[in-house]
Amino acid sequence: MNEAKQKFRLTGLERAWILYDVGNSAFVLLVATLIPIFFNALAEGGGLSSVEYLAYWGYAASAVTVITAVLSPILGTLADTRNFKKPIFTFCVAVGVIGCCAMGMASTWLPFLLIFIFAKVGFSGSLVFYDSMLSDVTVPDRMDEVSSKGYAWGYIGSCVPFVVCLALVLGAGSVGISQMKALNLALFITAAWWLVTTLPLLRQYKQVHFVEVQEHAIRQSFARIGHTLRHLKEDRQVFWFLLAFFCYIDGVDTIIDMATAYGTALGRDTTGLLLALLVTQIVAFPSALVFGRLSGQYPSGTLIPVCIAAYAGIALFAFFLKHQWQFWVLAVVVGMFQGGIQALSRSHFAKIIPPEKSGEYFGLFDICGKGASFLGTMIVSVGSQLTGSANVGVGSLIVLFIVGFVLFRVSDQK
């Protein structure tokens, strides 16, 4: 019994790594909730319709993912060089934090979207290095548990600044400020939270797995990318997993990124939407921990397909979503599987790649994850514009989950 307890006791470095998830998840939650409302207010002031608002928001998200897809493998490969990972990670965090603050200074919708792209690219870039740090902060037989705890505490920890921000926005009139001013303050609060929770990791992290510094490090990083891509097909498990991940996580991230925009386009009550998404975070906390524990009894190759199938059901349900209570049901079910599919995918990948090339491989992982989500957002945006129905746009994501499920089963047999 004591040995089992010791096995799951977090080290100081593991706690610092998890704490960064608590910080950046606050930004993710803000992007999924208050930031779309801020943009909606600016869009209405600029004369955009609800369909145009949803479409432009989707196009901005797509721009972020294309930029991330271009930068991730380059930065990830460079970060595998000794003593490069932490400085580049720090730079990306700084870009995200500064961008988060700067969004509050925009007064029209177009500058706001441009700054949002800037901040989201910094955030996405930081995740390439953060995810690749997993092989440095823990050992393979603890990866599923540590990764799950990262997502779990990220979900519940992000609620702390969010509740403060939500109370500030909803109660703006009672404290004598406008709602737009309250939204500005919410952005500053979130940026400060993100920065403070990053500091322990910056103090404690040391790169363990690396390649030695060579002359012309940037040129060598491009050469290593080419070598990895040429030989990727030889590692069938990694190759087919990345193809599967490209599809299913694209749908997951699109649902996360566009949930509030989707509900707003359907005319749902704003307060109800925000509270429903808060419930998603709360439900995701114990659910991610449960999946972490289940990973000790069942392989991730069994648990991940269960999560993919659940998301296919979520997309199907979105076709018929019309009422506020249905959005609440959707929020709860998403929370049940969101943390599991993200955490298990990250740890599953970390276990099947060479640890000394974690940055390089996680650069590819990020392309197939955050960098590939342009496809999902484009499906939603184009589908909404062509049919005039947000339900059809979001429901069409079921195709990504079906294809992802099939490809994952192929990868798990390699």
Predicted regions, residues:
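Helix-loop junctions at membrane interfaces in 12-TM secondary transporters
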Residues: 103-116, 319-331
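A membrane-interface helix-boundary motif in multi-pass transporters
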Residues: 50-52, 169-192, 382-401
